[in-house]
Amino acid sequence: MKTLFEKLKLENQKEILILNEPDGFAEQLAELVDIEIYQSLIQVNKMEFALVFVSNIKELENQIHTLHPKLKDDVVLWVAHPRKKSEKLQTDITNAYDWHPLIKHRYEPVKVLKINPDWEAVRFRRAEYL
């Protein structure tokens, strides 16, 4: 069975950015060896891989404003949010959400991945790399 980070295409990365990591993911992060993990935008210049956890649309809007300048053009960008079916977490992000904060920066959703019963992630790529 593939690990979370194999599913997220964490291949050949030497450094990654993980923002707003919720409880329950520290063990999976600890499994990553020989990879520098940054958990603050202050620590980074331009990243090739980012996994950002947000709970609602407002958090996403605020985070993308500061995150976008820190991403390389062909970044592997995943935005994780609570699943609508989660029994523990609430969110206003649904399948009908238009992802406007990302689309205005020319990021398009390309894949959806169930992380666990409470979280799912959407991968985005810049339109010019599709």
Over which residues does each language-model region extend?
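N-terminal, charge-rich interaction modules
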Residues: 1-29
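Core SAM-dependent methyltransferase catalytic element
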Residues: 121-130
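Mid-chain, well-packed structural core segment of small domains
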Residues: 61-93
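Mature catalytic domains of secreted/periplasmic carbohydrate-active enzymes
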Residues: 32-33
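Conserved acidic residues
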Residues: 14, 47-48
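Short acidic low-complexity segments
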Residues: 36-47
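Short, glycine-rich nucleotide/cofactor-binding loops
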Residues: 50-60
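C-terminal substrate-binding/active-site "lid" region of AdoMet-derived donor-dependent transferases
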Residues: 80-120
